[in-house]
């Protein structure tokens, strides 16, 4: 089931431009769990299926943040596996997942001119994180990732035998798979949006109540489902088992990323590490923030400002948004007011 769902994500990624055009987002994939359970071999195999003979991009401090983002911009509608991206041992910023989920630029900087010209590094690829331990700490990040766990107890004599057989295929032979997909691209391009919507509705009906999470998991599942319909590969029982597994993954994700306001949750959670000053003030059980200063303090991307402020207003702890003198400045300033409550208690 794990390998088939990962394959589905790779297939869906080839047509991610079609999915994004309709839904305005595309999820990330996380393959995580015990070492020596085949995660690295799986991503190498999947990349070779689509003509890319590489395991992925090692996420280490030897890579600069700009270098990684420029490398990502070289790919479009293809999966880039990020290998062992561990907080503290990589320059990759997991908060970048928030704007990249909506395919905002990986980086925007001012051009060396006197006008308002900017230079952007586009992001049109998809990302898979291959790691022993997941690094997604905020609800907002977790909600945007389809997580597939691997455990050493999953390895059997039969699965090891299949592993050995797959290892015998050359990259040249494996790439015929991707060629077959692209020769039938019209089939996928025509059906993928409706299929994602149908499977998303099914997952919601079966208990994956968070629509965003249902849609993320439906995208990965749709890649497999359309492939299976094209080549008539797996039995109905196999597909039923995989569907049930995907629904369970979605339900598990809801439990680990339970929130209707993930961006606001993440923003307020990051502010917990910012002392009182120009950005934030705390008084009794109240939190006051100046949005512009707070965004600078936590280096929050400006790309999803509208979504962020909309979530602020829906947040359970939101008390108001008005001009106030709480910051002690000569004139009142616009302030967002929240009741203070640790996210762990929500």
Regions found by a protein language model. Name each.
Residues 81-83, 108-110, 122-132, 146-149:
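Structural recognition of the conserved hydrophobic beta-strand(s) that form the central parallel beta-sheet
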Residues 191-346:
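DNA transaction DNA-binding modules
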């Amino acid at each position: 089931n794990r390998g088939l769902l990962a394959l589905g994500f790779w297939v869906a990624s080839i047509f991610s431009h079609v999915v994004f055009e309709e839904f305005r987002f595309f999820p990330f994939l996380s393959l995580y769990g015990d070492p020596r359970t085949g995660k690295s071999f799986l991503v190498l195999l999947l990349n070779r299926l689509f003509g890319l003979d590489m395991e992925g991009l090692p996420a280490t401090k030897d890579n600069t943040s700009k270098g990684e983002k420029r490398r990502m911009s070289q790919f479009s509608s293809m999966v880039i596996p990020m290998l062992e991206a561990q907080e503290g041992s990589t320059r990759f910023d997991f908060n970048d997942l928030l704007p990249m989920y909506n395919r905002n630029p990986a980086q925007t900087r001012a051009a060396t001119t006197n006008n308002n010209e900017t230079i952007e590094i586009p992001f049109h690829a998809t990302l898979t994180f291959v790691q022993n331990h997941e690094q997604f700490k905020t609800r907002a990040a977790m909600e945007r990732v389809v997580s597939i766990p691997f455990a050493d107890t999953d390895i059997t004599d039969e699965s090891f035998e299949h592993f050995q057989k797959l290892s015998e295929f050359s990259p040249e032979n494996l790439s015929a798979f991707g060629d077959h997909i692209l020769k039938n691209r019209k089939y996928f391009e025509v059906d993928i949006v409706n299929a994602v919507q149908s499977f998303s509705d099914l997952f919601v009906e079966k208990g994956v109540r968070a629509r965003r999470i249902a849609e993320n998991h439906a995208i990965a599942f749709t890649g497999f489902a359309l492939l299976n319909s094209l080549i008539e590969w797996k039995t109905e029982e196999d597909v039923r088992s995989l569907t049930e597994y995907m629904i369970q993954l979605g339900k598990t994700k809801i439990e680990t990323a339970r929130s209707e306001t993930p961006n606001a949750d993440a923003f307020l959670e990051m502010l917990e590490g910012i002392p009182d000053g120009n950005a934030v003030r705390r008084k009794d059980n109240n939190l006051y923030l100046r949005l512009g200063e707070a965004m600078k303090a936590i280096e929050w991307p400006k790309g999803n400002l509208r979504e962020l402020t909309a979530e602020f207003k829906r947040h359970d702890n939101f008390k108001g948004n008005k001009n106030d003198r709480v910051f002690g400045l000569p004139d009142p300033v616009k302030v967002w007011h929240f009741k203070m409550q640790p996210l762990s208690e929500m």
